[in-house]
């Protein structure tokens, strides 16, 4: 009985170790294209002055400008302007979070430690003070990424945490595109994005951003219009 228990323990320990050290080879990164698609959105701000915007829009530029924005429950220009500002912010954050994982973490593996914490889920922490400074994080702040991958190694969730300052979680559902499909969506921008990387278009993004200092939580969902 003891021998069997020992075997299971060793197998589990070896599996955990292998997964922990395998994050950077497990990760299969695809550049995301956000252009030339129509999307449905739902944005809610929870706090003292709650806000709620639902409707559809189109992303039309490299700055993720929301055009053709239509709200389901309001036609006031100030509401449309506010919704467009929030949409741009949500998309910029989602894209920046996604890209930073690759640009900062993947290319500078030695500056991060990866800890396996659950099936296909890793915690990434800064390994040195130099990396903290580059990421504009104070030396006393507790900061880390939680990254979930699917069975094939593609990103499904990124959580960026600076304790007592902010907590951002974004879930990604993506569709890999052929070079022809990517070019049709992104035009010349795909020549920059593609390189040797695969390209995807997101079909659904869900996220939340909380900041205890302002006592507000942003909850949003943006998905491709069928």
Predicted feature descriptions by range:
Residues 51-53, 108, 141, 214:
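Residues that act as N-cap/strand-start positions at coil-to-secondary-structure junctions
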Residues 20, 69-143:
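Flexible, processing/modification-adjacent segments and terminal tails
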Residues 16-47:
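N-terminal leader/targeting segments and the immediate start of mature chains
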Residues 44-78:
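N-terminal, post-signal-peptide region of Sec/Tat-exported proteins
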Residues 122-226:
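Gly/Pro-enriched, hydrophobic low-complexity segments
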Residues 4-14:
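Sec-dependent N-terminal signal peptides
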Residues 1-4, 19:
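Positively charged n-region of N-terminal signal peptides that target proteins for export
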Residues 31-33, 56-61, 105-117, 146-148, ...:
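Short, exposed beta-strand/loop patches in secreted or surface proteins that constitute
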